[in-house]
Amino acid sequence: FKIVKFMNMKGDSVRTLNFQQKGFDDETLNIADGLDANVTHYMQVSPTRDYVYISYSGRTPYAVGSDNDKGILYMYVEQYEWNGNPVRKYKLDTFSISMMVDGRLNRLMLITYYNDDPYFIYQLKD
């Protein structure tokens, strides 16, 4: 996702998160797998009762693959309250395209395919 919008149930209050990165390279549309040359925007959104968690790599898919081949695994997760105001940013020491948040136990759970043990659990800050 390039843009995530937070709004109330009436739709009269909206806050927009716009992934601020370098411009999109239109020439990549003419190349096989060319989109992978552009920085990945927000990847996953996981809501809880109190917060919304959004993940992203901050890199191009090519860079992610190259880093992962070298054993350099990381990604970012941003935590927002329901009005769209930032609370916290985490840099995780693994990379995943599957993220779940347990709001009751305050844990972030990831499933990866880069590790022999694919399950990662992070205790989030209160």
Language-model segments: residues:
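Eukaryotic scaffold repeat domains enriched in small/polar residues
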Residues: F1-D126
